[in-house]
Structures are given as C-alpha cells and as structure tokens.
C-alpha cells in the first residue's frame, strides 16, 4: 500500500477549506478533497452576507461582540468571538480587494450593509442575495492558480488515522454518479476538517447534498472532544414545499430589509413574543416563536411578506429569491410567500 505524501490535507472545499488553502504558506504541498464538484457545497448556497463592523461611525466592535453574545445566550467562547469580530473587517476587505469578490456598493463606493436577525446595526456585507456563491466562485479561481495545491473532486474520505505526528487517509475517488470508484491512500503532517454541516440527517433541509456530518465522525474517531451537538440551528424562513426534501432558503436579509412574518390568518405575530426585536430576533428565537404561534393557532401555515416594498427594489436586491419563488407560483412583489422553519 503506497501513500502519496502531502504537508496538509484539507477535507472540504467550501469557503472555509479554500480560504485555508489560500492563506497557508505557498511552500506547503496541499491536498484538497471535494466530495463532489467544487461549487456543490453549503457555502455556495449562502445568501445573506458576511457580518463585520465596516461602518465604525455607526457601529463598533463592542456592539458586535455584545450582539453575538446575546444571540449565543452567553455560551460563546469569548476569545473566539473577539477574533471573529476584530479581524472581520480586514478579511472582508481582503475578499474584495485581493480575491475580487464584488460586494454591493453604495453610491460613494463603500460597501453597502444590510441588517439581519440578532444584529443591532447594519453590518452585513453582501452580493445581492447570492453572497456565498460570489465568494466561493472567486476563491475557486484563486486556488486553481496555486501550483502547490492539488484538488480531487468526487472523493470521499473513508478513514483517517494518526500514527505519531502523521495522518493517514483512505480516500474513495471516482465518479460518484455510477462510475467505478477506487481507493487511494495519502499521508499528511496536518489535517484541516472543513466538511460542513449535518443537514442531510434531517428529512427536510436547505443544506447541500454533501452535508452529512463526516467531519464530526472523523474527528471523534481520532479522539477529538465533540461538544454542543444539541445546538442545531433551524432557519425560520425556508420556502414551504413539503413535496421536496431539498428546501429553498429565503434569506434572513429579506427580513432585514423589512419583511413581516405572518401567521395562518395573514396577521403579524412576533410582537406577542419578541416585542422589541420582532422579526429581527436571532434565528433560533424566531423559529421558537413560530412554534408557539403554531400551537396557538393550530396551523403550521406561515407567510413572509415584503410586498409593500417597491417592486424594483425587491427584484434588484433579491433577484435569485424572486425568480425562484416565481417558479413556484408566487410573486413576492405582490403577495406573501409560504415559509416554515427548516434545518
């Protein structure tokens, strides 16, 4: 059994995995494994944007940290929150200036910022309603130019073992759509597990097909401590389509731009549960409020309504969502759209 040697093995090719490869020393020999093709990942499905303090005249690190701790019910790792908040603005500018990400801009050329749940200030940098795809595709272009990085598509890491300071990987490669896969073997000094979420363990999910929690199992088998598995996020506004397992996400940014949540009677209800934050409470809170309202009304019917806004604004700000729900028979410039919480 021959093992091909690399310095670093990165499992997963979403934004986390690719950004890691781009920021490692160029002298390192890097192998990246993608379960399917590079753009089939949760990162490419992300719509809303990137939270960072880009407008220091109206925002601050302390406010962002406070919002994050409140949304995390103070269970956050404060050191990690500080790193995220304080390094965030520079990384957003790096995405824009170094990697070519085209964030939406204001008339003065600065990055346009929107509002999302749990945030007390506008701090979400975005590219219309397909921010993840914009970032992912630009990072892919960059990593494909690196001579020290090898990317293998259609590859599944079956087993990962460690002997002293070396990791050994058994990788199933080949056509995942019916071809003849083969086992290939690699070893590396370091491993980065960037395998994404666990959405596919649920009947209905907005996650990509590759999100099956592989990284958790791989890390556990190596002896890593696994924490907080009960903290699974359910997004309150997926398009309500119980005929399809793959649910389409309606970005939180739609509520950030003023959309209302309505119950089965087409009435707003968030004021009963969150009188201050209303529709812009954190996702887990909004989802819980919807469950309480379902108990109160006896109906699982919910709607999201932004139709009172200017139609041209809606079509320009949310072109992907607008066209997607139009295919489903709803014109969000004229009527509410059906939604329900989903992983």
Residues covered by each model-derived region:
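Glycine-rich active-site loop/strand segments that organize a redox cofactor
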Residues: 52-84
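Flavin (primarily FAD) binding-site architecture
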Residues: 193-206
């Amino acid at each position: 059994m021959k093992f091909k040697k690399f310095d670093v093995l990165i499992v997963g090719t979403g934004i986390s995995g690719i950004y890691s490869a781009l920021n490692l020393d160029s002298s390192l020999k890097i192998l990246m494994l993608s379960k399917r093709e590079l753009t089939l990942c949760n990162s490419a499905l992300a719509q809303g944007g990137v939270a960072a303090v880009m407008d220091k005249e109206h925002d601050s690190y302390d406010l962002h940290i406070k919002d994050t701790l409140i949304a995390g019910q103070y269970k956050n790792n404060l050191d990690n929150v500080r790193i995220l908040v304080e390094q965030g603005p520079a990384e957003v500018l790096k995405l824009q200036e170094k990697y070519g990400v085209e964030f939406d801009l204001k008339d003065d050329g600065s990055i346009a910022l929107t509002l999302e749940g749990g945030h007390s200030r506008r701090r979400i940098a975005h590219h219309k309603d397909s921010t993840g795809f914009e970032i992912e595709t630009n990072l892919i272009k960059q990593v494909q130019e690196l001579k020290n990085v090898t990317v293998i598509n259609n590859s599944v890491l079956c087993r990962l073992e460690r002997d002293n300071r070396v990791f050994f990987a058994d990788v199933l490669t080949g056509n995942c759509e019916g071809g003849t896969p083969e086992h290939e073997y690699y070893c590396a000094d370091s491993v980065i597990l960037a395998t994404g979420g666990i959405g596919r363990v649920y009947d209905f999910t907005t996650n990509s097909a590759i999100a099956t929690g592989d990284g958790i199992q791989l890390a556990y088998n190596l002896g890593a401590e696994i924490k907080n598995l009960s903290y699974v996020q359910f997004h309150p506004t997926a398009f309500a389509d119980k005929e399809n397992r793959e649910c389409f996400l309606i970005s939180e940014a739609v509520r950030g731009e003023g959309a209302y949540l309505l119950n089965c009677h087409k009435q707003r209800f968030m004021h009963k549960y969150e009188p201050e934050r209303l529709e812009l409470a954190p996702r887990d809170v909004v989802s819980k409020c919807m469950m309480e309202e379902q108990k109160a009304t006896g109906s699982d019917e919910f709607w999201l309504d932004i139709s009172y806004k200017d139609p041209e604004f809606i079509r320009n700000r949310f072109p992907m969502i607008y066209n997607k729900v139009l295919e489903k028979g709803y014109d969000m410039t004229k009527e509410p759209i059906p939604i329900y919480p989903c992983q």
